[in-house]
Amino acid sequence: MSEALTELASYLGEARGNLIAASQLKYGELTLTATGENLIALLTFLRDDAKCGFVNMIDICGVDWPQRELRFDVVYHLLSPKKNLRIRVKVATDEDTPVPSACAVYPGADWFERETWDMYGVLFTGHPDLRRILTDYGFEGHPLRKDFPTTGFVEVRYDDAAKRVVYEPVELKQEFRNFDFMSPWEGTEYVLPGDEKAKQ
């Protein structure tokens, strides 16, 4: 598999090296890094080229790196059924710089981009309907950002007396505690097949 990916990386470097900022083959997976300006051209080439054939977009996800200037990575996971290969295409962006929508190249990118915007706040230009898909309509913030509080801002619950859903500020019943999960109990010493070899 990695031999085929090595050949693919070499071919992509020769055929469309101007669209690829970096290429990395690690842990048996090929990752291409592109800029926002070259993203759509690269995705179109990967889909249409006979030696590539990445006709399926499996997923789009976000990664938050708060310490970086370009805080977010938008990662496109592609599949070539004919070649039985998977690759990733990465684009770095910040909170204010939108990424071009891949919906024209891969119509299935629609909901994936909505999810990435909903969870991380990454904007996509040219998206036909960029609105929340997983969180509630009035939700504030983007919950998969590393600076989003784990408790959230608002508690949503159904009020049986009012017969409706109510939104209230989060009220913690106790302070945060630091739990020590190390057990004071000593476990049984199990003798597993092959242990005698480890002692030699």
Curated annotation (Swiss-Prot):
Membrane topology qualifier: Peripheral membrane protein
KW Transport (keyword) present: yes
Pfam families: Complex1_30kDa (PF00329)
Subcellular location(s) of the protein: Cell inner membrane
Annotated GO CC locations: plasma membrane
UniProt KW keywords: Cell inner membrane, Cell membrane, Membrane, NAD, Quinone, Translocase, Transport, Ubiquinone
EC number(s) per entry: 7.1.1.-
Signal peptide (residue range): none
Catalysed conversion reaction: a quinone + NADH + 5 H(+)(in) = a quinol + NAD(+) + 4 H(+)(out)
Entry GO MF terms: NADH dehydrogenase (ubiquinone) activity; NADH:ubiquinone reductase (non-electrogenic) activity; quinone binding
HAMAP family, per the entry: NDH1_NuoC
NCBIfam families, A to Z: NuoC_fam (TIGR01961), PRK06074.1-5 (NF004733)
Family recorded in the similarity comment: Belongs to the complex I 30 kDa subunit family.
Record PANTHER family: NADH DEHYDROGENASE [UBIQUINONE] IRON-SULFUR PROTEIN 3, MITOCHONDRIAL, NADH DEHYDROGENASE UBIQUINONE IRON-SULFUR PROTEIN 3
Oligomeric form and interacting partners: NDH-1 is composed of 14 different subunits. Subunits NuoB, C, D, E, F, and G constitute the peripheral sector of the complex.
Record's function text: NDH-1 shuttles electrons from NADH, via FMN and iron-sulfur (Fe-S) centers, to quinones in the respiratory chain. The immediate electron acceptor for the enzyme in this species is believed to be ubiquinone. Couples the redox reaction to proton translocation (for every two electrons transferred, four hydrogen ions are translocated across the cytoplasmic membrane), and thus conserves the redox energy in a proton gradient.
Protein's name according to its UniProt entry: NADH-quinone oxidoreductase subunit C
Organism: Rhizobium etli (strain ATCC 51251 / DSM 11541 / JCM 21823 / NBRC 15573 / CFN 42)
Gene name of this polypeptide: nuoC
